[in-house]
C-alpha cells in the first residue's frame, strides 16, 4: 500500500491497515517528516480550532490525552510522529519527495509511481492522502514580484528572519494580507512584538470565544480505556438526534418558515459576535470593519480570545478593503485606494487551494484515463473515496464526502472503510477492486440532491466553502445529507460489496 501524503489521513488509515495485517506500507511525503499540515504550519500561535480530545486521532490506541482543550501545533506534530513510530511507518517512508505521476498498468495490475527525485515505485493499492490544506494559495496580485522587502506564506514561516520568539521584529514594520483562520492566530503574536502591523482585510472573520484550558490530571485519569471512541459515539448519536428533529420539523412547517427560523438563528449568532466586537474593540470605525456581514457558515468560524484586543494596540492598523482585497503591491508594500503602505515584511495569510482537482498531479487509470480529464466536467466518485476506472485507488479528503466541522471524524470513517475494502480484496484474493459506474452515478446524484443551489451559497462572500463563488460546481462540493447518513451509506455499501464493486482475479 502506498500513500501519497503523510498527514492524518495516512497515519490513521495506516494504523487500521496494520491492525488488519498489512505489512508493506509506504508513505511518500513532500515534507521532511509526517504530519501534513502540522508539519508545514509552524507559525506563531498555531493550534487546532476543534477540541483536541476529538480532533487528534488515535488517542485510545496511543494511550494519550492532549495537554490542552485546544492543543497547540507542536503537540499535534509530536503526536503525529508518535503514531508513525508506534506503527512502524518510518521504515519505508520517503520524505522530501513529491509524487509526479501515478499510472495504472493493466498487465501487471499495479500502480507505477514516479517522483521528482527520479524514483520509480510499484504498488498494488494507492491512497491519495494529499490533504485539503496541502497546497499554499498565494494570491495573484499585480506587482507582487516588485516588492523589495522580505515576504513569505504563513505555512512557510521564516523563523530565520523573525526569530524563534519574533524577537527580531521589534524594529520591523509588518504587513499581513488575509484575516482567515491562520491570520487570526498569528496577528496577536505580531502585535506584541512588531514595530507596527498593517492588517489587510478582504472579508472579516467571525470571531467567537475560545474556551481553552489545560487538561487536569484528575480529568485525564477518569477517562479510562476507549474514552475517545465513546466521545465520538456520543457526538454521532447527538447528530442523529438533531437530524431526526429536523426531519420531524420539516414535515410540520413550510419551506418559508424553515428558512425564517434558520435566518433568525443566524442573526442571533451574528448579533452575539457583533456585540463582542463592540465590547472589545475601542475604536468604533475599526469595530465596524471587523464585523462579519454574511451568514455564519459562509466562512469557517474562528475562535480566539486575543485577536480582537490586538486591534486596541497603537501599533496595529486595520486596512479594510471592503471586500475588494489587495489588488496591487509596489516596491515598498501593498497599495490600496491609492495609498502604498510601506512595510519591511509582508506575510501572505491567503490560505490553501481547497477543493482543487489538480492537486493530485498526474494520475492515469485504466484505459489511459487521466483523473483530471475525468473530473474536468465535475468530480465523479462514490463516497468521495472511489472513482470508476481507477482500480485499487482510494481518495481521502473532502471531495463529495460528508461535510464535518471536525475533519478527523470524516478521515476516521474513510480510513476504516478503505482498510475494510483492502482486507476484503486480500481475503478473497482479488487482484483489483473498483467501483461500478452505476454506484458512482448514484452518489453524484446524492451529492447534487443534498447540496442544491442554496440561497446561502449565492449570498456568501467568496471562500473555499463555496468555491470562491463558483455556484455551477455543485457536484464538486461535499455531501450535505449529514454525517450520520454518510456513515450509514458506508455501512450499507460494506454489507453489499458485490453490488457496488467489480473485481478481477487470476
Residue ranges and their predicted role:
Residues 2-34, 129-272, 341, 379, ...:
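Rossmann-like dinucleotide-binding core of oxidoreductases
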Residues 3, 8-90, 202, 279-281, ...:
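Beta1-alpha1 glycine-rich phosphate/pyrophosphate-binding loop at the start
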Residues 63-82, 94, 261-263, 295-306:
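Short beta-strand to alpha-helix junction loop
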Residues 67-133:
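Feature captures the FAD/FMN-dependent oxidoreductase FAD-binding
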Residues 95-110, 316-333:
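A conserved short coil-to-beta-strand element within the FAD-binding core of flavoproteins
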Residues 120-133, 175-177, 334, 342-353:
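Short hydrophobic core segments
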Residues 138-151, 332-384:
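Central helical "cap/lid" subdomain
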Residues 412, 416-506:
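C-terminal active-site-capping segments
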